[in-house]
Amino acid sequence: DVYKRQELTEEMKKVKAEGTEVEKVVAYCNTNMCVKIKPEELENVAALKVAMKNLAVKYSCNAIAIQCWNALQGEIGIMPCAANSLLNEEGIPVVCETDIHGAITALMVEAAGRNDKRSFFADWTVRHPDNENGELLQHCGPWPISVAQEKPTIGYPLAFSHPGAVEAQAKLGEMTLARFDGDNGEYSLLLGNAKGVEGPYTKGTYVWVEAVSYTHLRAHE
């Protein structure tokens, strides 16, 4: 189902007026994350998180795909990345750029893992500078904080001027690569194994991974 942005912003106003749940989220962020945005901006992050969760409960949604830029910033003044991260940590998958197939993928892999671990939504971006089978998985910051190997930072994204992005490198180790996708009624599922490896620093939430056969994986994505 598709819900209008206005309903989300109205719910944000409502939860900010009520205060209690928003205050809890603000306190959680200050305890578990390095906050490098203004207090009023953090309040908006918290309000967005609470509002999205309320609407998910109201409409019986178990995952969310949000239109994260750029109309939203004109209304609430923040990127939704940190709010997405907080919900992902609670087991409500939230993906960016209204990626419905990404939301379905998140539900599938978390169900396959019996919801014991959180998934993270990433773009498959550039080759590793020193590893022929390496690739950078990165996004503006929607990854759950339990994925991070360090205390995540709420700050500013690389490509936008509004606050609310998250920065952290993910833990290294074995992981599953998955993507459910569709085109004109034809559906497919890409599955692969990879491991996190060391690589250059970058902005956002990121991890460098090594696939067993990069060329084979690329051919089937």
Describe the role of every protein-language-model region.
Residues G91-W208:
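C-terminal catalytic subdomain
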Residues G77-P93:
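A short, gly/pro- and small-residue-rich
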Residues D1, N62-A71, L158-V166, T176:
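Charge-patterned, long linear interaction tracts outside catalytic cores
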Residues M12-A17, G74-P80, N131-L136:
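Short acidic, glycine/serine/threonine-rich loops at helix termini
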Residues K4-A27:
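Glycine-rich phosphate/diphosphate-binding loop of Rossmann-like nucleotide-binding domains
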